[in-house]
Every structure is written in C-alpha cells, then in structure tokens.
C-alpha cells in the first residue's frame, strides 16, 4: 500500500511544490489506509514547503455524521465546481473500473455503489482547510 512508500511520495512532492502552491489530498484521518498514508505524507510536505494544504474527506462520508467530534468540521469549506471541472471529475472517476464495476473473479458488487458515486459527483467539494 501507500504506507510503504510515503517517503518516496513526500520526496517527489517536495521537489514539485512552492510555498505559493496548494496541495490537495485525502484527509489524513479518512478511514482508508491509503488515503490516510497519502494525507499524512502530504501534510508533512505542506508543512516543510510552507504551502497551503486542502484535505478532502472521501471515505469519511461513509462513517461520519455531521456531529462526529472526530471530524474537523470547523475547518470545512465548500468549493463550487465549474461545469468543466465537474466534467473532468466525472472522467477521472470513470477510470476507476475496480471501484465502479462488479468483480467478475469474485462475484462481488462494485466497491462504490450508485449513492457513493452520486456523492462524489456533486457540483462542489468539501475540503478541510
């Protein structure tokens, strides 16, 4: 998983970022090990570089409630997406066949049900700033 290569991820990102950049990543306490490892690596890089960090709750929506004290709702902001941005997001999501289609080798349903993909394709993003 990503946890095995966070040092490489941090090194690669650190070489690309400037203090004036914004680094967008999964929230570091999202509840998925790859999301969390990526989020922690990005948070450290943002701290070192001095750039802005925007964290996205992804799996958080599956387990948290609006009152959940584990989630930094006080840091949440909604960013509206332009139609072109939403179209690009739709294209990107369509690339994740392993998440969207049933697994023929196991017979298991898609990992992301229709209600989850609908949430991913809202015309705004919630970010923790």
What are these regions (language model features)?
Residues 27, 59-63, 73, 115:
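A residue-identity detector for tryptophan
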Residues 48-70:
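Short, flexible loop segments at boundaries between secondary-structure elements
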Residues 33-35, 57-60, 105-108:
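A short linear-motif detector with a strong N-terminal bias
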Residues 100-129:
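C-terminal and late-domain segments of enzyme folds
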Residues 1-52, 87, 91-95, 109-111, ...:
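Active-site beta-strand->loop->alpha-helix modules in alpha/beta enzyme cores, enriched
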Residues 65-109:
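A conserved mid-domain beta-alpha-beta active-site/ligand-binding segment of alpha/beta enzyme cores
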Residues 53-54, 79, 125:
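A broad, low-specificity signal marking well-ordered, structured residues that form hydrophobic/aromatic
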């Amino acid at each position: 998983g990503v946890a095995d290569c966070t040092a490489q991820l941090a090194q690669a990102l650190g070489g690309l970022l400037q203090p004036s950049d914004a680094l967008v990543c999964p929230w570091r306490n999202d509840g998925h090990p790859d999301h969390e490892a990526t989020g922690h690596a990005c948070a450290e890089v943002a701290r070192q570089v001095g750039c802005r960090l925007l964290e996205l709750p992804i799996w958080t929506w599956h387990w948290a409630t609006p009152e959940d004290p584990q989630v930094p709702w006080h840091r949440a902001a909604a960013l509206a997406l332009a139609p072109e941005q939403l179209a690009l997001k739709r294209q990107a999501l369509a690339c994740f066949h392993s998440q969207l289609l049933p697994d023929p080798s196991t017979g298991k349903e898609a990992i992301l049900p229709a209600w989850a993909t609908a949430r991913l394709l809202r015309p705004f993003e919630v970010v923790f700033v």
